[in-house]
Amino acid sequence: MIRVEFLKVFRFLTVLPIGEHPKSPREIGEQAWLGLPAVGLVSGLLAGVVAWAFAGTPVRGCLVVLTLLVLEGAQHFDGLVDVGDALMAGVISEEGATKAMRDPRVGVGGLAIGSMALLLAVASFGWIPFEVLVPIEVFSRFTVLPMAAVGEPAPASYSGRVFTEYVDADQVLLGGILSTVVSLPFSPVATLTCAVCSAVVAWTCLEAARRTIRGVNGDFLGASIWVSRVLSAVCLSSLPW
């Protein structure tokens, strides 16, 4: 039964044609502890292969970022851009923040945050060792679990409800153990660094979501993945490998 549910989680989180489309939030939420780190493992391996194949070339960082964007259908990056618009509009009012997130157009806040994230990601991924891509991707996905376990869903948010209703402390513990076990063989230093970055980002994004739209939604969850990814990559790129 876990196998079937896991495949549905994988289909929900990526563009890869694996498994059936989930028919209910329960099918996604109850296996999030397994699906999120597993998706991170696959994306990290694919990105790592690209980083290894193009090591020493000026396009390495661009191709790694492109690989990640394609794999996730750019949905997490879209969430990051929406959050950028919401944070700017949220200074005025909560209604303005919600409206900004639903607006298909990109505002100044989204453009600024999205551009900065891409620039930092391209620069960092062009420098770091290819093997640390797995810990980065695994723990960037793990960031969703503590946010969902502690946070409440934002009003009228399907994605927020998918995770917040079914993710609890046990899932956070299981997901943390799984993420650590999967990441350690690739790089103990990167595993510790990414775990710390994930915790910091989860708390920061959760507080931002509470203050902006009174809860967690899919955009903030997706944004947390990107912020954790970029922060981990920047920190690791500063180490003397």
Curated annotation (Swiss-Prot):
Keywords: Cell membrane, Cobalamin biosynthesis, Magnesium, Membrane, Transferase, Transmembrane, Transmembrane helix. GO terms for molecular function: adenosylcobinamide-GDP ribazoletransferase activity; cobalamin 5'-phosphate synthase activity. The chain crosses the membrane at residues 34-54, 108-128, 184-206, 220-240. GO terms for biological process: cobalamin biosynthetic process. It is an enzyme of class 2 (transferase). Pathway: Cofactor biosynthesis; adenosylcobalamin biosynthesis; adenosylcobalamin from cob(II)yrinate a,c-diamide: step 7/7. It catalyses: alpha-ribazole + adenosylcob(III)inamide-GDP = adenosylcob(III)alamin + GMP + H(+); alpha-ribazole 5'-phosphate + adenosylcob(III)inamide-GDP = adenosylcob(III)alamin 5'-phosphate + GMP + H(+). It is found in: Cell membrane. Its EC number is 2.7.8.26. GO terms for cellular component: plasma membrane. Its main location: membrane. Pfam families: CobS. Its cofactor is Mg(2+). It is a multi-pass membrane protein. Joins adenosylcobinamide-GDP and alpha-ribazole to generate adenosylcobalamin (Ado-cobalamin). Also synthesizes adenosylcobalamin 5'-phosphate from adenosylcobinamide-GDP and alpha-ribazole 5'-phosphate. Belongs to the CobS family. This is Adenosylcobinamide-GDP ribazoletransferase. It comes from Methanopyrus kandleri (strain AV19 / DSM 6324 / JCM 9639 / NBRC 100938). The lineage of its organism: Archaea, Methanobacteriati, Methanobacteriota, Methanomada group, Methanopyri.
